[in-house]
Amino acid sequence: MGWEYAQVHLKYTIPFGVVLAAVYRPLMSRLDVFKLVFLITVAVVSTIPWDSYLIKNRIWTYPPGVVVGLTAWDIPAEELFFFVIQTFNTSLLYMILSKPTFHPIYLSKKTGWGKIAGQILFASAIIFGLVSVSSGGEGMYMGLILIWACPFLLFLWSISYQFIVNLPWTNTALPIALPTLYLWVVDTFALRRGTWSITSGTKYGVVLWDGLEIEEAVFFLLTNTLIVFGLIACDNNLAILDTFPEHFPRTKGVPSLLTIIRTLILPKEKYDEERIQGLVSAVALLRKKSRSFYLASGTFEGRLRIDLIRLYAFCRAADDLVDEAPSVDDSRASIEKLRKFLDLAYEENQEEPSQRLREYVTSSIPEMFHMALLQLPTYYLPKQPLDDLLKGFDTDLLFDRKSGAFPIETTEDLDIYGSRVAGTVAELCNHLILYHTPEAVPEDIQREVVASGQEMGIALQYVNIARDIKTDAEIDRVYLPLSWLKEAQLTPEDVIQQPHGPTIEALRHKLLDRAFEKYNMAKGAIDKLPSEGKGPIRVAVESYMEIGRVLREKGPTMKKGRATVPKMRRIRVAWSALNK
């Protein structure tokens, strides 16, 4: 009896797992737990017969003095735990690295030659392994590794090829390479100390470096590849399930085994390419226009994340359609076209856009905005907030420097404006969270959450205005209430001419004070949201309010005339928000 093998876990594998678990804990969802338990179960069940064979046939040996003595199927308890901890660690690393990834945009109907090439590679490895095992001798251990691992890899490659090759390398190569290199180092220490060993005559005798047998290097590379490919296959299936509701009606929570099988056999010809391209466009817009929302979106999951991105894409498209029009009259015409679009969409009340609605959009709206409008989930969103959003756009068009028209006269006017352009969006986000949650939320709590969301939206808009005083002045707009300017002995023209200085800073801080007042009043309702939305919404809110905190500090980081939050600070804010 000995503790040497156990010390390998205590020194190397468990601490690594504890760190990864601590990092990912705030992001862990029920779906993540399901994937983790499923992968660990498959890893343990599939490895036990193989490892038991190695030990019984003395291909792989352990000196009696290095293990505690507890065994199952001749496998030491420490070795069984290795199956668990390796899968746990590699899975968590993959989840951390892939959390920001929006998987639906990597779905594709195309099947390139790479799929066949990969299948040939893994099939050839299986054949080579079979020949090596049947021949015995020095290729025995390598052959056993290949005939055990490569059939699984062949299957996973066949069902998830497009994801494996299309996902960013940080989702594929990196979560394989990092734990593999780490375990190569750990294995080198163990082999040198004799904690375990490969029997001579069953190995090639080739080393990757001094102390690391080539068979061990291949084993850890293939096992980590198996784990990552398995997780990619899970994400591939979930992306299919979430992206195509016409094939998979509304689902909540962990999908059933039957549903997963149905996603596997769905022909790629039935993928809705228009929907995929619409999501690609929406994500590109999100990355470009709002880093705060993009960071927060990664903490949502499934159809909720898809619909939030679709909602944001519509809001950005509508804003650009109005703001980028060549004249005020064209902007007003764009608003009327958007009203007509909403009237038609809600009049028909269909989950998918009708031919009539498509024809209207394609004939009236510039092509670059088609996807954003047609993918708005109007079927389960209320119409009033969207109508109010357009009223906010109407207010923007009332600004006229030449005639001296500045529509924000009082604090109440600013509250109304903030409610229309930001409170409405927060309200719609909460409606989506409540729609997609599997939890039953009492109606009184729903009303409270929606109302508080409106107030929080106003708070965020105050931050936005405080940040953009100079930017707005450049387009002849002053959102500071005229009553505030009068108290400060300023006119809108003064702000446009000189949007900086002590007086402007005092007004900026007044905006921020009101923003944080509303924020403090509304933030308690976040805790009443369903678990799927609580943490992510807090991240979205705190990420944006951090801009306000930066503005309150001296020497904010500026980019294109705006205060920005440094990347590492944004990450710390998100981490803190998720841990509340």
UniProtKB/Swiss-Prot annotation:
Highest classification ranks of the organism: Eukaryota, Fungi, Dikarya, Ascomycota, Pezizomycotina
Glycans attached where? 89
Keyword Repeat (UniProt) = no
Q: Which family does it belong to?
A: In the N-terminal section; belongs to the lycopene beta-cyclase family.
The residues that cross the membrane are: 3-23, 35-55, 65-85, 116-136, 139-159, 171-191, 214-234
Reactions performed catalytically: all-trans-lycopene = gamma-carotene; gamma-carotene = all-trans-beta-carotene; 2 (2E,6E,10E)-geranylgeranyl diphosphate = 15-cis-phytoene + 2 diphosphate
Its name, as the record gives it, is Bifunctional lycopene cyclase/phytoene synthase
Q: How does it sit in the membrane?
A: Multi-pass membrane protein
